[in-house]
């Protein structure tokens, strides 16, 4: 998801939703990424401090920053979302291990979060089946 640490709006609640999902789906193959849309202010140190507010496990939840032009390209080409400084979506997206976008859902609507969790579980189950098949060859 795209966010910024000083957001006066929904970003904290969106990241809280991700924290809740990570607690519920306790699978090491499920990794969440929160990508800032304010890289000038959201330095790695600032993001580390922000992540601490959620007791984020850095192995399972990445808070990322970078060059704004690259972040914009990732938003439009990968997430299919427009991204500008201070402008972001309230959506969480699911990608499989092949990097394919499988779906995105609004993080502040309970019914949508439930669908997001189902999709995550479905994708993890697909990966488990694939991993199991690979192990037997």
Where are these regions (language model features)?
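Structural micro-motif
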Residues: 61, 78-93
């Amino acid at each position: 998801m795209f966010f910024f640490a000083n957001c006066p709006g929904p970003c904290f609640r969106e990241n809280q939703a991700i924290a809740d999902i990570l607690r519920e789906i306790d699978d090491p193959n499920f990794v969440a990424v929160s990508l800032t849309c304010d890289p000038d202010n959201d330095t790695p140190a600032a993001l580390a401090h922000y992540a601490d507010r959620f007791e984020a496990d850095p192995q399972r939840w990445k808070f990322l920053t970078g060059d704004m032009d690259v972040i914009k390209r990732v938003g439009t080409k990968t997430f299919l979302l427009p991204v500008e400084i201070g402008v972001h979506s309230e959506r969480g997206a699911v990608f499989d291990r092949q990097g394919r976008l499988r779906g995105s859902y609004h993080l502040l609507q309970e019914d949508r979060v439930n669908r997001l969790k189902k999709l995550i579980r479905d994708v993890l189950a697909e990966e488990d089946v694939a991993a199991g098949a690979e192990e037997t060859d």
